[in-house]
Amino acid sequence: MIARIWSGESPLWRLLLPLSWLYGLVSGAIRLSYKLGFKRAWRAPVPVVVVGNLTAGGNGKTPVVIWLVEKLQQRGVRVGVVSRGYGGKAAAYPLLLTPETTTAEAGDEPVLIYQRTGAPVAVAPERAAAVKAILAAHNVQIIITDDGLQHYRLARDIEIVVIDGVRRFGNGWWLPAGPMRERASRLKTVDAAIVNGGVARAGEIPMQLAPGLAVNLRTGARCDVAQLSNIVAMAGIGHPPRFFATLEACGAHPQKCVPLADHQTLAPADVQALVGEGQTLVMTEKDAVKCCAFAEDNWWFLPVDARLSGEQPDKLLEHITSLVR
């Protein structure tokens, strides 16, 4: 229903316009207060790169963060990552991730980024506190913040926006009548706009999510996902249909697709109940970090990597690297 409202297919969005105007008024006032100096943002002693969205819902932001961290690491840059830690609840904040940190504490995306990149990761509702925790514990040269484009309390040097190339900005309205956190005109002030799928427009960086081999949660074995049979697909991400479409494009045709809420807590019994005898469960890598502790032999995940094309990605990386002292 929300997808139909935000796309404009359902006329119900009009009923939510008063709330959207209020949202837009408040969010605009907050941004203006920082722009005019009525409120002061905290500036870290190292460059800060924000990777965020203008819209609610999954746009492919986490793969972009992983891509950026890995590319900077390849250039010899010491990178730290901070996040709000949505879906997690730690005993105390800020929380520096360790190999023992669970998704229940830190959230699924920070754990995934930590496992994939090995970079220091810290979570806290106040991102400045997370940055300070990393700087106190690690000699990093740059901070990447996973989400937080609208978190103006943290000053930033580079802003990168990730856009869903198919859904774009839906009906163009602020939350809750539409998907917008800020107006589309905000794109004029960011350093880069990365478009996940669809057709990139002038000045935007095209990106595709490239699937790898399916990985068994229990054994780590790998195989072409199309070789798996009787698949039940599960996706607890911002936009589950994208994952299901990826499976179809890989030649894996699920018997059943189970969309879950983003950052949803997964109970072992609930996940186990999705799969019948002779069936195979295939999930996203983000779901896998939540399920690995209780995985069955027939559970697999399909990793995806961001693939950015054209000359702009290298120019962006050069610009970011030039900020490192």
UniProtKB/Swiss-Prot annotation:
The keyword rRNA processing does not apply. PANTHER family: TETRAACYLDISACCHARIDE 4'-KINASE, TETRAACYLDISACCHARIDE 4'-KINASE, MITOCHONDRIAL-RELATED. InterPro entries: LpxK, P-loop_NTPase. This is Tetraacyldisaccharide 4'-kinase. ATP binds at T55, A56, G57, G58, N59, G60, K61, T62. It catalyses: a lipid A disaccharide + ATP = a lipid IVA + ADP + H(+). Pfam families: LpxK. GO terms for cellular component: plasma membrane. It comes from Salmonella newport (strain SL254). NCBIfam families: lpxK. SUPFAM superfamilies: P-loop containing nucleoside triphosphate hydrolases. The gene is lpxK. Transfers the gamma-phosphate of ATP to the 4'-position of a tetraacyldisaccharide 1-phosphate intermediate (termed DS-1-P) to form tetraacyldisaccharide 1,4'-bis-phosphate (lipid IVA). GO terms for biological process: lipid A biosynthetic process; lipopolysaccharide core region biosynthetic process. Belongs to the LpxK family. Pathway: Glycolipid biosynthesis; lipid IV(A) biosynthesis; lipid IV(A) from (3R)-3-hydroxytetradecanoyl-[acyl-carrier-protein] and UDP-N-acetyl-alpha-D-glucosamine: step 6/6. One of its GO terms (molecular function) is tetraacyldisaccharide 4'-kinase activity. Its EC number is 2.7.1.130. Keywords: ATP-binding, Kinase, Lipid A biosynthesis, Lipid biosynthesis, Lipid metabolism, Nucleotide-binding, Transferase. The keyword Nucleotide-binding applies.
